[in-house]
Amino acid sequence: MEESTAPIEAHAAAGAEAGAEGGEGVSVPPPPQFEAAGASAGVSSAPLQQASGLAPLLVTPGPAIRRAASLRPAPAEGGGARSGPERNSGSWTKQILCRYYLHGQCKEGDNCRYSHDLSGRRRSRGGQDAQPRASADRGPKMATRWEPPTQEVAEAPPAASSSSLPLIGSAAERGFTEAEIDNAGIRSAAERGFSEAEIDNASLAAGAAAGAGAEGWEGAIEFVPGQPYRGRMVPPHGPEAPLQSPAIEREHMAMGMGMPMPVPMPMPVPMPVPMPLPLCRYAARGQCLRGDRCAYPHGEICDMCGQQALHPWDAAQQEAHRRACVEAHERDMELSFAVQRSMDKVCGICMEVVYEKADPSDRRFGILFSCNHTYCLRCIRRWRSATQFENRISKSCPQCRVSSGFVIPSEFWVEEEEEKEKLVQQYKEGMSQKACRYFAGGLGHCPFGEFCFYKHEYPEGWRDQPPRPDGGGSSSAYWHQVLEPVQLREGNVLFKSRKKEHSVLRLANQLLKKLLCLRGSSSFSDDRWLLLQYQLEEYFSLNL
């Protein structure tokens, strides 16, 4: 029985170490040596191989055997089963390091079924023979005895060993931080009796060698408790982690450790600049009855207006007031000069001084744009509205016979060209706000057409022009609007024509209405209707 079980026990002893490391994802210390396992370690499958005529061959446990061996303790000496307390005590789980403890997230603490001792792991990585000891800050841990591995385990393929990687890189891949690796190396060196200087030199040399072997390990993200762990090594072709400011890193550290967030310092709020008190309005207009007892400041006297309008504490207000006073003074001077020029002007028709007329409404000038002769507004309008002269004579100047298109009313006499142009522009802007009485909202006819200064506006709801018979509207409605007489107030005469023209217009209106009613049964063609409409429009535009 012992010979038959010896290979199986050897495989189990070798698979316990490989299975714990490959199945759990972390490295574990070698299992404790039992007497049966130690006795059977030296026994190999040589007798069987010699009997069959085969060369001696080392047997390496497969993945399935490793997994089974990692989940099953080695049998006791003599092939018998272990005692009940040893099987149910769960001591085999203490040989496996807790993966949550490696990441700093184990919630069980000292009650955890898995091992929290890191000294055995460090010795197995470094090949040291020192006995593991319990951590002072983690409480007492189960200590196991370690012996050198057998020849079969030592001659395992190099794929099972991670010594090809540098110490810092390999430890970082399995979850160790840089501080834990340094502390473990210092403790093991101190146990062997090295001095502090030798330890420092060795640590510096190891750090330089590891930095040369690990690609980008110095740019790795620092492990933060409570945040997803990313390891110590940076992938050679992976994306680089974004840089964080020290303030953000401190906030993350505070959040992971459960500490209160740092309260940001409030930004200093600028103090509002107090507005100066307004000036006393009574003192600015004349005299304040309160005098020095007034709650409001009294302004300084302005040289231009002579009032207490300058604020003693506000330089901007003083500058603005002086500028306004200068502009007002310039306007007053221009008005004074205009009045002085107009004082002795005599009308060329009535031969009276314009400013000395009895009726104040007649004290206005009628300025012609093309000449500089002086006329009062009433006389020049009477001259231009006379019918006993030809149109070219009545629209021209009575003295120089230079024709002018319009007369500009003004209270002051203007001679210079620039002032005349400014006066004409102001006159046109004022007239454009008034409705033309000849246009009559689209129902009349303005003889000036597009040259009229008054506003030609259609009633609300109409377009720019009334609906035409060929533009979508009914012809009867169009001609009814055109031929219907316009209702005006008494005293307003829209059409100045003779009695004969009124009678002709009335007869044409009646004839057109009758023709429109008989259009469906008449033999008029479309060309004749268009010709009739054209002749009527031309007649009305000439005689209205």
UniProtKB/Swiss-Prot annotation:
Classification via Pfam families: MKRN1_C, zf-C3HC4, zf-CCCH_2, zf-CCCH_4
EC numbers for this chain: 2.3.2.27
Phenotype of null mutants: Mkrn3 deletion lead to early puberty onset in female mice. Mkrn3 deficiency also promotes DNA demethylation in the hypothalamus of mice.
Composition-biased stretches (Low complexity): 9-19, 36-46
GO biological process, one term: protein polyubiquitination
Ranges where the record places region Makorin-type Cys-His: 302-329
Catalytic activity: S-ubiquitinyl-[E2 ubiquitin-conjugating enzyme]-L-cysteine + [acceptor protein]-L-lysine = [E2 ubiquitin-conjugating enzyme]-L-cysteine + N(6)-ubiquitinyl-[acceptor protein]-L-lysine
Coarse class of the protein's main subcellular location: nucleus
Positions of RING-type zinc fingers: 347-401
Membrane-traversing stretches: none
GO cellular component, one term: nucleus
Compartments (UniProt record): Nucleus
Pathway assignment: Protein modification; protein ubiquitination
Single GO molecular function: identical protein binding
Zinc finger residue ranges, C3H1-type: 92-119, 274-301, 430-459
Miscellaneous field: Imprinted, expressed from the paternal chromosome only. The maternal methylation is established promptly after fertilization prior to syngamy.
Name of protein: E3 ubiquitin-protein ligase makorin-3
Gene that specifies this protein: Mkrn3
